[in-house]
């Protein structure tokens, strides 16, 4: 009996250990939707960045005025501010914080769209689409402006980028292997194709023309699995391209986030995304118009058709291609960046 007791004492801890769930299974999956704006219910165009001062993740997004009952035409997507949400649990849950204090309001009814943000030498740089007013249609100039901030909350104007036309939107900025910078954007005057500009120092920019002869907006460039990737919004899902040199891009036949999901507010195409790579995982943050699902569309111009929310899914790499299953539970685990 004594020998049996010794054996049981040795075996019991291993049984308990075997029954203990893995750390990942104990975590909660991200909710659907991931985030809804409490002011206008029109969150879109997300970008995620680590806030060094607060030691939390921040999400910046275009705050479309979906619930504005006085809007007519497309005024509800103009006159917009940039909202901020915060996550203290590695990106699983997000809480509305404020709108960004952007010190560039040169025109009455000014419009801020689709920021991208990078950090360099302790200073944050925002590249923001600026529209000089609130308009009922799309036929007006738009430029990309650069602002800087020490704290991600308060932003000072630096310059308007010298890009190729006066109708450009949706900056995506990436540090090249040699330490210089490249910015991709949508040139609306050239069939909404993707153009690019380079800078040695984030201050002086040279436009090099077309990067991708494809219609699309909201380019996002990132590195994962020893390749560079670009994802663009084609209004029918997200087109994927890969490159070895950040100049020559090969298309992937299949789009991602084209087929509707089953989760709450995720039954429409995914649009204008950000991708965060952390600890070998890549998470795609995108927005949907829940009221624009093909199966059950809301009436045109209704609040239900205008509202938008942020969702998240984990990217998967298989046979040289990117894919994602938006219906899989997504365990977001964004780690503090090493820098």
Where are the regions a protein language model picked out?
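Bacterial N-terminal signal peptides that target proteins for export
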Residues: 1-4
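Hydrophobic h-region of N-terminal signal peptides that target proteins for export
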Residues: 8-17
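Carbohydrate-active catalytic/glycan-binding domains of CAZyme proteins
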Residues: 19-339
């Amino acid at each position: 009996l004594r020998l049996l007791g010794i054996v049981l004492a040795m075996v019991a801890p291993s049984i308990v250990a075997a029954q203990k769930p893995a750390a990942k299974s104990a975590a909660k999956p991200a909710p659907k939707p991931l985030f809804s704006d409490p002011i206008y219910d029109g969150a879109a165009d997300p970008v995620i960045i680590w806030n060094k001062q607060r030691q939390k993740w921040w999400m910046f997004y275009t705050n479309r005025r979906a619930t504005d009952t006085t809007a007519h035409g497309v005024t509800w997507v103009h006159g917009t501010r940039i909202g901020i949400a915060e996550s203290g649990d590695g990106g699983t849950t997000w809480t509305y914080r404020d709108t960004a204090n952007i010190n560039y309001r040169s025109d009455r009814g000014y419009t801020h769209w689709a920021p991208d943000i990078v950090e360099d030498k302790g200073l944050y740089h925002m590249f923001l689409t600026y529209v000089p007013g609130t308009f009922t249609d799309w036929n007006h100039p738009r430029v990309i402006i650069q602002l800087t901030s020490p704290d991600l909350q308060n932003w000072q104007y630096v310059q308007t980028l010298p890009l190729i036309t006066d109708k450009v939107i949706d900056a995506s900025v990436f540090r090249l292997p040699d330490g210089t910078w490249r910015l991709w954007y949508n040139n609306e005057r050239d069939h909404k194709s993707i153009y690019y500009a380079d800078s040695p120092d984030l201050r002086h920019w040279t436009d090099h023309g077309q990067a991708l002869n494809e219609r699309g907006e909201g380019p996002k460039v990132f590195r994962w699995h020893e390749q560079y990737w670009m994802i663009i919004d084609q209004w029918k899902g997200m087109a994927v391209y890969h490159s070895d040199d950040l100049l020559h891009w090969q298309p992937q036949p299949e789009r991602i986030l084209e087929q509707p999901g089953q989760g709450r507010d995720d039954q429409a195409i995914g649009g204008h995304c950000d991708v965060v790579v952390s600890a070998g995982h890549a998470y795609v943050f995108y927005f949907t118009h829940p009221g624009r699902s093909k199966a059950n569309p809301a009436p045109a111009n209704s609040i239900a058709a205008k509202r938008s929310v942020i969702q998240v899914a984990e990217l998967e790499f298989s046979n040289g291609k990117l894919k994602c299953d938006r219906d899989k539970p997504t365990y977001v685990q964004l780690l503090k960046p090493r820098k």
